[in-house]
């Protein structure tokens, strides 16, 4: 990662979410900042604040977030909290759901308020989810939280969004560590085009896994360098037809066939010869010469 030679054993991840008056960082402003710190597989701290944007919060943003003009009028300006936020993020890895928006918007606002440029590495949970949770139908944060059973009481509130994104990150990290090493190796090779330092995060997680190799899950097998789940074929011991005794006599054959077939003496004799040959356990070959019209096909198939 840029600015980080390797992932530390106790690396801190700053999971951030912003609510803003719009999507244009040149004219819109932050109205809510939420951050959850994650370290060693656990949430260790959180910080959230409303922010007075010094401009009107558009009605559609109020409707989406539930954040009103009255609420933010009592909040500090971003200039008042910028340095606190900057120092809170120092020496962390920035994490966000759609990292390009949150990182770039926040970095611009911090510089506007006089902090040094934000240069910490950043990873994107949208792309991590797309890679490691590929069967999900949607990668919107609200949809993922519902599908994965993550508590998300206030969607589009920065503190709630940051909290559920942190929980998503932890879930994805566990998923990564559960994968076969050869699978992680392939993913690391193919992740070069992911956002910011997401690829390096995947690569370094793979490097850590190589140092602590665990046996391959018995449910998988490696074929040509690819870990594949073993196909489980259920074995059924079930008869789908009724067994019956071979109809040796004329009467038995007529009962079996009913009116569908006409009884043929030569065909019946051929059937009995074939049946006796298979049931008597003889090692001799059986040779039968039958005239046209005898019914040879049924004569050897029925027994």
PLM feature segments, named:
Residues 1-122, 134-156:
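Conserved non-catalytic scaffold segment of RNase H-like nuclease domains
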Residues 157-172:
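Acidic, divalent-metal-coordinating active-site segment for phosphoryl/phosphodiester hydrolysis
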């Amino acid at each position: 990662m840029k600015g980080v030679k390797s992932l530390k054993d106790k690396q801190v991840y700053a999971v951030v979410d912003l609510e803003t008056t719009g999507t244009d960082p040149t004219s819109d402003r932050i109205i809510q900042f939420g951050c959850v710190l994650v370290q060693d597989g656990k949430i260790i701290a959180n910080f959230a604040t409303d922010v007075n944007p010094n401009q009107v919060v558009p009605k559609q943003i109020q409707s989406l977030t539930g954040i009103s003009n009255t609420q933010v009028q009592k909040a500090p300006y971003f200039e008042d909290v910028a340095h606190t936020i900057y120092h809170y993020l120092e020496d962390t890895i920035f994490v966000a759901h759609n990292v390009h928006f949150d990182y770039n918007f926040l970095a611009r606002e911090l510089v506007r308020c006089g902090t040094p440029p934000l240069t910490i590495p950043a990873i994107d949970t949208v792309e991590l989810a797309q890679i490691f949770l590929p069967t999900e139908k949607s990668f919107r944060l609200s949809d993922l939280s519902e599908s994965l059973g993550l508590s998300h009481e206030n969607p589009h509130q920065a503190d709630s969004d940051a909290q559920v994104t942190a929980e998503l990150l932890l879930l994805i990290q566990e998923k990564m560590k559960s994968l076969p090493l050869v699978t992680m190796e392939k993913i690391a090779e193919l992740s070069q085009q992911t956002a910011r330092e997401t690829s390096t995060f995947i690569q370094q997680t793979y490097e850590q896994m190589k140092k602590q190799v665990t046996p391959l899950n018995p449910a998988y097998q490696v074929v040509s360098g690819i870990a594949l789940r073993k196909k489980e074929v259920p074995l059924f011991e079930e008869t789908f037809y009724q067994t019956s005794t071979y109809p040796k006599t004329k009467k038995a054959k007529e009962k079996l066939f009913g009116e569908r077939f006409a009884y043929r003496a030569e065909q019946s004799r051929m059937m009995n010869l074939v049946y006796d040959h298979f049931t008597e356990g003889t090692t001799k070959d059986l040779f039968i010469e039958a005239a046209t019209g005898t019914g040879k096909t049924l004569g050897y198939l029925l027994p």
